[in-house]
Amino acid sequence: MTYLAPALARIHPDWEAVLDQAAVAARLAEIDRLLVLQQQDGKTLFPPPPQVFNALAFAAPADVKVVILGQDPYHGDGEAMGLSFSVPDGARVPPSLRNIYKELAADLGLGVPASGDLTHWAQQGVLLLNSVLTVERDKAGSHGKLGWQTVSDALIDAVNRDNPGCVFLLWGNWAQTKAERIDASRHLVLTAAHPSPLSASRGFHGCRHFSQVNAWLIARGRQPVRWATAPAAQSCLF
């Protein structure tokens, strides 16, 4: 590996066996080759190479509490950081995340965080996973055909198989196609419209997923997620 080597060096060791599966490893090698070629052509790719597998840096598959699936990284400068829906501290909060925060506030009565950095969720076992893990600058969906789905599906399968019970939040039609990979007899699967401004009013707002997640975890003897640990300052969102 060349382009992906810095990112692979940062993952939790329990994910290594998943990425070492023959089909997954072969796909990763091909993705790595294509990313190197794009980089050599002068294309700017996001997220930065060390952050491509940021979602896998915090918890083993067996320790994940919640999976929040995204589609592909943000394609603007200074936005993508390897966690679905998350942006670095100081970056403008994107519209979909703004709606996630609004629902979080309405559901739990908490203040709206000023920062769009969701690292504090990841540190508690929230797997913020995009299906496609890279993108070319200013070209949404540009890496959708590189084969990343083989990799991300294997990661979902590992959580489904190895985790004693977690919650999958499937927001939007695309994420809901992954429901067939999840054993709903062991895991809780919650679905809603995507938080994008185009669809949030059609079933995302009012879904109360955050309180449902914690009630389910507590009932099974697991620690709830501290959804709001960053300073709240709603005026910073707009």
Swiss-Prot record:
It is found in: Cytoplasm. One of its GO terms (biological process) is base-excision repair, AP site formation via deaminated base removal. The keyword Lyase does not apply. Its main location: cytoplasm. It is an enzyme of class 3 (hydrolase). Coiled coil: none annotated. The keyword DNA damage applies. Belongs to the uracil-DNA glycosylase (UDG) superfamily. UNG family. This is Uracil-DNA glycosylase. The gene is ung.
